[in-house]
Amino acid sequence: MKMIILIAKDHDADMITQTLTSAEYRVTRVASTGGFLRSGVVTLLLGVDDDRVDDAIGLVKSKLSSSSGEKRATLFVVPVERFEQV
């Protein structure tokens, strides 16, 4: 299992969340602040099976592709040693 940590601009977060939940990914949304101008960003956390990581990233890329070359999200994929629901 992997944890995808996705940091996106506020105005993109709803679209990304809807896209991922429609594909049956479970998403936790955390408000955060970052960047030089302290602009509003959202951090999304996804617990994803190893074989679905590329699919999840592909969905995000398909919604955020930009012809201007602007980077609209930052993603980290980290291993999860243990996962429990209580």
Model regions: which residues?
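Positively charged, small/polar-rich N-terminal and surface patches that mediate targeting and assembly
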Residues: 1-86
